[in-house]
UniProtKB/Swiss-Prot annotation:
GO terms for molecular function: 16S rRNA (adenine(1518)-N(6)/adenine(1519)-N(6))-dimethyltransferase activity; RNA binding. The keyword Transferase applies. Keywords: Cytoplasm, Methyltransferase, RNA-binding, rRNA processing, S-adenosyl-L-methionine, Transferase. S-adenosyl-L-methionine binds at residues 13, 15, 40, 61, 85, 103. Its EC number is 2.1.1.182. It catalyses: adenosine(1518)/adenosine(1519) in 16S rRNA + 4 S-adenosyl-L-methionine = N(6)-dimethyladenosine(1518)/N(6)-dimethyladenosine(1519) in 16S rRNA + 4 S-adenosyl-L-homocysteine + 4 H(+). Gene3D superfamilies: Ribosomal RNA adenine dimethylase-like, domain 2 (1.10.8.100), Vaccinia Virus protein VP39 (3.40.50.150). InterPro entries: KsgA/Erm, rRNA_Ade_diMease-like_C, rRNA_Ade_Mease_Trfase_CS, rRNA_Ade_methylase_Trfase_N, rRNA_adenine_dimethylase, SAM-dependent_MTases_sf. Belongs to the class I-like SAM-binding methyltransferase superfamily. rRNA adenine N(6)-methyltransferase family. RsmA subfamily. Specifically dimethylates two adjacent adenosines (A1518 and A1519) in the loop of a conserved hairpin near the 3'-end of 16S rRNA in the 30S particle. May play a critical role in biogenesis of 30S subunits. It is found in: Cytoplasm. SUPFAM superfamilies: S-adenosyl-L-methionine-dependent methyltransferases (SSF53335). This is Ribosomal RNA small subunit methyltransferase A.
Length: 265
């Protein structure tokens, strides 16, 4: 086995359970000519079986030692190694129809999910291993304790499905939390979408800044500009009770009313 030591600063937990690897690859269902990008290949647990099924793979790896190892293990015509922090990579550069996969570092999972939204037009689907708690928030419904800003922002852009849990023992070193695998497929171009992505993001962030308080109080100076009845939002509603479509309507209404602090598209 490799002498490579997991580096805490990179949030490294290497997947070692072959049955879990097989389940992930089966869920992805790669075809020979698929355009696949793997984030954080680590010790190649997913890289190997993916390359058994596809012609070429692009891997994004921040750890220079692991990047060098990958270059030694696989020929350049089969594997392109991008040695970089995934948070700085423009995934749109890899072309259309991308299938993005990876055992994501848990310490940057939410920022990375938001970063990847910028390339959603180029993406066919995404399959990620994440902390189970994060995935529960991603797929949560309004009214549940897990429903959050992350839920709203991602559900406005993706159709998501939690596939299965993964025990800590499947990793080396084992994390202190249970993991899970999620499938994310970008919604079509004709989806319900806000007039301004920036305004939508601002409104959702402000709404969840005090999630237990009534939304009218949290929005404060915007409350008088909001057509509450038209949006179907109850006077006592909290952010965690408001659906994605209602948040899109809320952001659009505030933008149209000239609410201060909202950037026009």
């Amino acid at each position: 086995m490799s002498a490579h030591q997991a580096r805490k600063r990179f949030g490294q937990h290497f997947l070692t359970d072959e049955s879990v690897v097989e389940s992930i690859v089966r869920a992805i269902g790669p075809a020979r000519d698929d355009r696949v990008v793997e984030i954080g290949p680590g010790l190649s647990a997913l890289t190997r079986p993916l390359l058994d099924r596809i012609d070429h793979l692009t891997a994004v790896e921040i750890d220079r030692d692991l990047a060098a190892r990958l270059r030694r293990q696989y020929p350049a015509e089969r594997l392109t190694v991008v040695e970089a922090d995934a948070l700085t990579v423009d995934f749109a550069q890899f072309g259309q129809g991308l299938r993005v996969v990876g055992n994501l570092p848990y310490n940057i999972s939410s920022p990375l999910l938001f970063h990847l939204m910028g390339a959603a037009e180029q993406v066919r689907d995404q399959h990620f291993m994440l902390q189970r708690e994060v995935i529960d928030r991603m797929v949560a419904e309004p009214g549940s304790g897990d429903y959050s800003r992350l839920s709203v922002m991602l559900q406005a852009r993706y159709r998501m499905e939690k596939l299965f849990d993964v025990a800590p023992e499947a990793f080396d070193p084992p994390p202190r939390v249970v993991s899970a695998v999620v499938r994310m497929a970008p919604l079509p171009a004709d989806r319900l979408r806000p007039a301004s992505d920036a305004a939508f993001e601002t409104v959702v962030a402000r709404a969840f800044s005090q999630r237990r308080k009534m939304l009218r109080r949290v929005l404060d100076d915007w409350a008088a500009l909001t057509p509450w009845d038209e949006l179907g939002i109850a006077p006592t509603a909290r952010a965690e009770e408001v659906g994605v479509a209602q948040f899109i309507g809320l952001a659009d209404a505030l933008l149209a009313a000239g609410a201060p602090g909202l950037a026009r598209p």
